[in-house]
Amino acid sequence: DAGADREVLETVLRSIPVSGFGIAISRVQKAALSACDFKVILDAAHENHDHDMKYLYGKEESHAHGGHFHSEESHTYGEHSHSEESYTHGEHHHHEHRGLTEIYSIIDGTNMLDSARILAKKIFRILAEAEAKAHGVPVEEVHFHEVGALDSIVDIIAAAACVDNLGVDEVIIPALWEGEGTVRCQHGILPVPVPAVTNIVMEYGILLGKIGEPGEYVTPTGAAIAAAICTSRELPECYRIVGNGLGAGKRDYKRPGLLRALLLETEEPVYESDSILKLECNIDDCTGEALGYAMELLLENGARDVHYIPVYM
């Protein structure tokens, strides 16, 4: 929505060497605002509860996931598709989980640009390190369970491809705004922010803002993406907005889940600035000859100016 080339994104997603997923890109309404919705559609073997509000915040487990999204903007990738816009990626492997090495192999199997591939691996590395710290295991032993890994793989590869395609020099993230309370996940009910998010924002110095509403607004995947791309927290003093993107979240909170990205341009100042260090001291009982010699040495070694002022006490 901020200006990344959709054809580039779809070409990358078609090349992912994993089956069992599709995507749908559409416009949706959030708080009466039109936002871009990027939806990863998983087949029955990969469906998860990540967007099921009753499961996430209710007292009873829910298995309602809703139907698949079938529109003209929907593209299914993998052997389970029967549409003209489907792409097959080989057999469907029934792994219970994927390690970081296997995920790296999946990323290497795409036709992403090298710069985008490096970014995708960086995001997953940040995520794996945060999970490893949370569970007290080495990074090599962290496994992303398949019920949640496939959509994360697609999300992260898509994010890396889009950010790389935009060709931005800096990414400024003043803060991530987080909710409060608890959320249900695979390991039980956890406080918000969840441990993986906590570890990421601690490690990378990301500021969290308090929304004051219950719910998990910052997910581990989102925090990892932010940590990987953020270069600054401070907006430039003056800038020109040249692009604007609004992305829709999937969870249904009281406060609409929206992510805004602004493309900014800055101009070089018409003036030049420099910094000068001024040194001052009091000198007692020193001859004029010594002071004169000291002045010569200071000027020879780069001092802009040297002067003496007599002091009477």
Language-model features and meaning:
Residues 38, 151, 226, 298:
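Divalent metal-coordination and catalytic microenvironments
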